[in-house]
């Protein structure tokens, strides 16, 4: 992910909105406010998995990195807002597979 941190200006971004402004992406501010953690977690996963292609021309390589990061951020936003959070979010709280139920009587038995 070193390629991402080398993009000029990225180290100054402090909020989800600042990322979208930096990469010149239009988003619904209400959705961004309510789902920013999920979007940015998805973006981080995509950044970690991405392997950019570097060109001999350093200026073109920098622009390609910016375009790749922009595309990954846009994909993260689209994926997260496309449906309900419990199916679209990659956060662990939504990935619990084993539900459990403890009956009221069982709870009363433990009581001193």
From Swiss-Prot:
Domain of life of the organism in this record?
Bacteria
GO process annotations (BP): nitrogen fixation
Q: What InterPro entries does the annotation carry?
A: NifW
Determine if Translocase is one of this entry's keywords.
Answer: no
Which keywords does the record carry?
Nitrogen fixation, Plasmid
SUBUNIT field: Homotrimer; associates with NifD.
Similarity comment: Belongs to the NifW family.
* Function of the protein: May protect the nitrogenase Fe-Mo protein from oxidative damage.
What name is this protein filed under?
A: Nitrogenase-stabilizing/protective protein NifW
**What is the organism lineage in this UniProt record?**
Bacteria, Pseudomonadati, Pseudomonadota, Gammaproteobacteria, Enterobacterales
Which gene does this sequence derive from? nifW
């Amino acid at each position: 992910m070193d390629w991402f941190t080398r993009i000029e200006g990225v180290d100054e971004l402090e909020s989800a909105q600042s990322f979208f402004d930096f990469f010149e992406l239009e988003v619904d501010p209400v959705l961004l406010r309510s789902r920013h953690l999920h979007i940015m977690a998805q973006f981080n996963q995509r950044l970690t998995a991405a392997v950019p292609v570097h060109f001999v021309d350093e200026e073109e390589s920098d622009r390609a990195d910016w375009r790749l990061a922009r595309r990954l951020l846009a994909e993260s936003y689209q994926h997260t807002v496309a449906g309900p959070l419990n199916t679209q979010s990659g956060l662990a709280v939504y990935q619990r597979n084993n539900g459990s139920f403890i009956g009221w009587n069982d709870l009363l038995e433990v009581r001193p």
